[in-house]
Curated annotation (Swiss-Prot):
One of its GO terms (cellular component) is mitochondrion. Keywords: Isomerase, Mitochondrion, RNA-binding, Transit peptide. It is found in: Mitochondrion. Residues 1-20 form a transit peptide. Belongs to the pseudouridine synthase RluA family. It catalyses: a uridine in RNA = a pseudouridine in RNA. Its EC number is 5.4.99.-. Residues 92-162 form the S4 RNA-binding domain. InterPro entries: PsdUridine_synth_cat_dom_sf, PsdUridine_synth_RluA-like_CS, PsdUridine_synth_RsuA/RluA, RluA_PseudoU_synthase. The active site is at D232. Coiled coil: none annotated. One of its GO terms (molecular function) is RNA binding. This is RNA pseudouridine synthase 3, mitochondrial.
Length: 478
């Protein structure tokens, strides 16, 4: 009897536990609604503080190159220099409207003069600053801070003079684009693309290379040249375009991973095997090995905002979809100012291949590549730049010359531009092989065609900011 009661109590308790556990409320949690979408849990971390850059301390009036008593439209009349005048002077390549917008939105700040008010010092050691208006009168030693994004707006005005309703460039733009041409024959056009000029334009971009080529680079043909490969907007160097449908098809095969080696013509296959592209890049740090082969597949992922994509190494990332990516590299010299020059030869053609391989595979991101090397840039700028001379073993450092023009965009500037340049390229002579392959077997080849080389080699000079970095690192050593 006692055992039956005990068993009944156990069953009763079990039933009660099951019953009330089902109706028990779940643990408390926060429900957030944004854009008609409900989210559980605490909110995500908000945006990080805006990254800022500082202008040099204000040197005084008049500014270099300005007349002391001249009245100007920048608001520096009457013997005073305003804040917007100083910003326009420093960022002379940026539109006045963009600079005015930064002032209107309250994005321009100034350090408290002389840092005299100790009570304003923040506990975390941050520099105390205040927002200023465009007509703030500058005093000697004043220091202005702006968002880093303003330096990314340095686009030459000659690219933005096309009216929004038309894609036809004006005479100055046509002349400028034609000066970029380094080689031209019946099959191809080779240009030395400057940085910040987009190659492939989207709907709102009217100044891309493909949009301007039809009007500026047709050179008498009914149709303009077409792109056969791409360079990133910030990347400079050799860019090849096809002038005819046949040459475009051949170039597409040449720039593919198969390198066009699928023809019965042995000379063509041999020329395709000899084809290569060579880039020069300035990287932060120095690879452990002086030369080598990077074989690291890449995957493209979409970030949380649903709009921005990013290329990552597929190895160890858990992504199944990936593309093979192979790059040869060679270090060109010793590390100077915490950086070293590297020669890159891509064997495959993948989006952002060189930038990701340098940043993630070698651990040495390219100078000016803030997408794949922002944290390394931040740490690099905070470190003392002292290096060891490889032959003598003595320390040396880079002499930092005075003057704004010397440092703009170079390795010494606050925000360096991307230091990646397609310097050299070897291609099959498309015009010659098209003539040979289209020639009837019974017809003899013209002597002038036979004498032409099977390969064409091109070399493009570096843009100004990379030339400055090269000269500084090779000539200004203490």
């Amino acid at each position: 009897m006692w055992k039956a009661k005990t068993c009944f109590r156990q069953i009763y308790l079990t039933v009660l536990i099951r019953r009330y556990s089902r109706v028990a409320p779940p643990p408390s949690s926060v429900i957030r609604v944004t854009n008609n979408v409900a989210h559980l849990g605490p909110p995500k971390q908000g945006p990080l503080p805006r990254q800022l850059i500082s202008l040099p301390p204000f040197p005084g009036h008049p500014l270099p190159g300005k007349n002391a008593g001249a009245d100007g439209d920048d608001g520096d009349s009457g013997g005073h220099v305003t804040a917007i005048s100083w910003v326009k002077y420093y960022f002379e390549e940026i539109y006045d409207k963009a600079i005015q917008t930064h002032f209107t939105k309250g994005l321009v700040q100034m350090e408290f003069r002389g840092r005299r008010d100790a009570s304003r010092e923040k506990e975390d050691g941050a520099i105390p600053m205040r927002k200023i208006k465009h007509n703030e009168v500058m005093q000697i030693g004043d220091k202005i801070w702006l968002p880093v994004s303003i330096a990314e707006m340095r686009i030459s005005k000659r690219y933005d003079t096309i009216p929004s309703g038309t894609l036809y460039p004006n005479a100055d733009e046509i002349a400028y684009l034609q000066r970029l041409v380094r080689f031209k024959d019946s099959a191809i056009i080779v240009l030395n693309k400057p940085p910040k000029l987009p190659v492939k334009g989207n709907v709102p971009i009217h100044n891309s290379m493909d949009a301007l080529a039809a009007a500026a680079l047709s050179f008498g043909n009914d149709e303009g040249p077409r792109l056969v490969h791409r360079l990133d907007r910030e990347t400079s160097g050799l860019l090849v375009m096809g002038r005819t449908k046949e040459s475009i098809d051949y170039l597409h095969s040449v720039f593919s991973d198969y390198k066009g080696r699928n023809s019965s013509c042995k000379a063509w296959n041999k020329a395709c095997e000899a084809m290569y592209q060579q880039y020069w890049a300035l990287v932060i740090g120095s690879p452990k090995e002086k030369e080598g082969l990077i074989s690291a597949p890449l995957s493209k992922v979409l970030l949380d905002d649903g709009k921005t994509d990013r290329v990552v190494l597929a190895q160890g990332s858990g992504f199944e979809a990936s593309q093979d990516a192979i790059t040869e590299y060679k270090v060109l010299g010793p590390k100077i100012n915490g950086c070293s020059w590297v020669e890159l030869r891509p064997i495959t053609s993948r989006k952002h291949q060189l930038r990701v391989h340098c940043a993630e595979a070698l651990g040495t991101p390219i100078v000016g590549d803030y997408k794949y090397g922002w944290f390394v840039h931040k740490r690099w700028k905070q470190m003392p730049q002292v290096d060891i001379e490889p032959t003598t073993g003595k320390p040396y450092k880079l002499r930092r010359p005075e003057g704004l023009d010397v440092q703009k965009g170079s390795v010494l500037s606050k925000v360096p531009l991307l230091h990646l340049h397609c310097r050299e390229m070897v291609l099959p002579n498309i015009a010659k092989f098209l003539h040979v392959m289209n020639q009837q077997e019974t017809e003899p080849l013209h002597t002038g065609i036979i004498d032409k080389p099977d390969l064409l080699r091109f070399v493009a000079s570096m843009p100004s900011h990379m030339k400055i970095s090269w000269n500084l690192m090779s000539s200004y050593l203490v």
